[in-house]
């Protein structure tokens, strides 16, 4: 397989950013993010016959979209905790693959890196790298794969998916039809000079491997049935609680990882476990904010399970449900931004403390299910597949398996040693494809 790079440049907004918008203050919630790049990959099986026109339209509409999301084309100033919206641009690459898309998909999963390979120079070779980068990959069959990377400092998955849908709409019907983003978090929750939170642990020298596993609808139905049977001696109230598919898959994966931990130590008893999830706070508080506010606006959910011997799936879903329910109940009463900031900081402190201490199993998850990633339509239909890429630490991403249905695709990023055990776990193999 050969990959030809046809274009590599910094793409700037189509018109300059006005002087009064050239500094965007970051919020406290932006400030505390680990500044890594989140990757998104959108597969489109068939485009129009003229790929040159398609690529030109994608480029021009992206440049127009950057006039609304002007901060994305700027640079991060960590000293002042602002984005300097100076129109330096985002990374932009066009490539051509000499194979058909279905052949590419049959290859090794590491090929995902090929879909972003042209962006690596942008993101690593400069002192002030772009905050985002896009790579357009054309295939012999007329298929297109769009790879996107966003620095987490500029926003969460809600913000990233909104940007992609805005770009798609600009390409499909014109920039005038695209809603302007709102930036209301920093005035309410300004950045701080001193954060007083422990740093995340260092994983220098650890090789992480990323693999994709799919729980289709049938597998989730089977998993729910098994969990019910497993808890056959539980009380009636617990049986009435129906965990979400995200909680169910999270609990199953955590159970598998706990069993791996026991096997690694040749013990029947595991350490206590902490399941960590991220919860979108939009529409959950009483703060005077737009429902589609851009930036990072989520809280860390720390769900602890103290059961150290053969935990059941229902034990773990109960821990998740209890932790999530408590936060939902608390934030629903809050109309003070300082209280929200304090809650978020405390959740991050607890997570980083336990993550670094090493006395508990810490399983880090994030769910992108129900985010409109499968609605990113540039004019030739929705993507047939949406995926993500590896990150430099242990993380399990849960995504919708397909445009419709209740299946879940899992992108697991684990250490090389743990991944070998994980993908051979007998129960996991009975559910995933």
From Swiss-Prot:
InterPro entries in UniProt: CAT-like_dom_sf
Annotated tissue distribution: Expressed in petals, style, sepals and stamens. Very low expression in stigma and not detected in leaves.
Keywords, in A-Z order: Acyltransferase, Transferase
Group of enzyme by EC: transferase
Catalytic machinery residues: 152 (proton acceptor), 377 (proton acceptor)
Bilayer-spanning residue ranges: none
Disulfide bonds: none
Keyword Cytoplasm: no
Its EC number(s): 2.3.1.224
Substrates-to-products reaction catalysed: benzyl alcohol + acetyl-CoA = benzyl acetate + CoA; (E)-cinnamyl alcohol + acetyl-CoA = (E)-cinnamyl acetate + CoA
Gene3D superfamilies attached to this UniProt entry: Chloramphenicol acetyltransferase-like domain (3.30.559.10)
Short name of any one Pfam family annotated for the protein: Transferase
Molecular functions per Gene Ontology: acetyl-coenzyme A:acetyl alcohol acetyltransferase activity
Posttranslational modification: The N-terminus is blocked.
Domain of life from the UniProt record: Eukaryota
Family per record: Belongs to the plant acyltransferase family.
Function of the molecule: Involved in the biosynthesis of benzyl acetate, a major constituent of the floral scent. Can use benzylalcohol, cinnamylalcohol, 3-cis-hexene-1-ol or heptanol as substrates. Has some activity with 2-phenylethanol and 2-naphtalene-ethanol, but no activity with linalool, 2-hydroxybenzylalcohol, 3-hydroxybenzylalcohol or 4-hydroxybenzylalcohol.
Protein name: Acetyl-CoA-benzylalcohol acetyltransferase
């Amino acid at each position: 397989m050969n990959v030809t790079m046809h274009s590599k440049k910094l793409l700037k907004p189509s018109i300059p950013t006005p002087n009064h918008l050239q500094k965007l203050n970051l919020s406290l919630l932006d400030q505390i993010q680990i500044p890594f790049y989140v990757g998104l990959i959108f597969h489109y099986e068939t485009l129009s016959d003229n790929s040159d026109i398609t690529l030109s339209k994608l480029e021009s509409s992206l440049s127009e979209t950057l006039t609304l999301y002007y901060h994305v084309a700027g640079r991060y100033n960590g000293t002042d905790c602002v984005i300097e919206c100076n129109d330096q641009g985002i990374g932009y690459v066009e490539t051509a693959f000499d194979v058909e898309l279905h052949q590419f998909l049959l290859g090794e999963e590491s090929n995902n890196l090929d879909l972003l390979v042209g962006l690596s120079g942008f993101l690593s070779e400069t002192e002030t790298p772009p905050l985002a980068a896009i790579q357009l990959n054309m295939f012999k069959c007329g298929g297109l794969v769009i790879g996107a990377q966003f620095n987490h400092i500029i926003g969460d998955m809600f913000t990233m998916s909104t940007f992609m849908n805005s770009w798609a709409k600009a390409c499909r019907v014109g920039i005038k039809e695209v809603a302007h983003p709102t930036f209301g978090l920093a005035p309410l929750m300004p950045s701080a000079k001193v954060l007083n939170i422990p740093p995340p642990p260092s994983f220098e020298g650890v090789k992480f491997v990323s693999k994709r596993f799919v729980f289709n609808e049938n597998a989730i139905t089977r998993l729910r049935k098994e969990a019910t049977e497993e808890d056959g001696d539980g009380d009636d109230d617990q049986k009435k609680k129906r965990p979400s598919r995200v909680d169910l898959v999270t609990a199953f994966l955590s159970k598998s990882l706990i069993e791996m931990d026991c096997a690694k130590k040749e013990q029947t008893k595991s350490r206590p476990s902490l399941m960590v999830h991220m919860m979108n706070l939009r529409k959950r508080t009483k703060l005077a904010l737009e429902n589609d506010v851009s930036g990072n606006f989520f809280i860390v959910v720390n769900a602890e399970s103290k059961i150290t011997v053969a935990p059941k799936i229902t034990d773990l879903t109960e821990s998740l449900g209890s932790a999530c329910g408590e936060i939902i109940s608390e934030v629903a009463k809050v109309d003070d931004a300082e209280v929200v900031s304090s809650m978020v900081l405390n959740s991050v402190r607890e997570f980083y403390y336990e993550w670094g201490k090493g006395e508990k199993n810490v399983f880090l998850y994030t769910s992108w299910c129900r985010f409109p990633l499968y609605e990113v339509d540039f004019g030739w239909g929705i993507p047939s597949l949406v995926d993500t890429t590896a990150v430099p630490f242990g993380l399990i991403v849960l995504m919708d398996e397909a445009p419709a249905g209740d299946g879940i695709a899992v992108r697991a990023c684990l250490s090389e040693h743990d991944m070998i055990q994980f993908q051979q776990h007998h129960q996991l193999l009975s559910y995933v494809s």
